């Protein structure tokens, strides 16, 4: 009997033990897989060093808004959906994900996000199953709306205020905000109004020095990524090689037009085979 009581105590203790959470970067590497049709680095998601801090900020209770003011093809979208996958798996709450158009959203969801869910075990386990087939219920997991077991993710295009009007959400994603009308962004922000705990994740490549992502960046604490200089060892600001100290382009690269796909993504194999300096 004493052994039985001891075993019962241990099992009860497990039920009330605090959950051990892995940091987002480690979680992403263990659970997120990129297919070769969406990344030139297929396999387990290896987060670039400059993307680690934004991912970790998603679980910082003192941070409500994460702004990625990054250059094009710098892993903005990959970083973002790895972070969203983490939040939906570990801290599930209703989410609204807005893109410049409904077509953008539908193509992204169908071509990248849904396959990503299929390869991410924790997120796939949140998908309801059909009683008839035993497979993922395709009536609840659709291109524009995924009704997970613990929360709902809705995609929307920014073409009209009606598209972004939905029930209140805790997570709001604004993808490529420089392509989204400011009035639409304000309407979207109404979806988190009154929430004590919320996250706004917004990304874009800056186009102008006024408005858009650059203005949002200036509103924040303006973090930059520094790396050790390969020559002197001092930490220097990370910048793309094709720009000089004044920010001017030193050279540009051209590649075959068909390397850019209809959904706006790129076929890196075609880029590698056709790229040339100008």
Question: Language-model segments: what does each one mean?
Answer:
Residues 1-278:
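Phosphate/NTP-binding elements of NTP-utilizing enzymes
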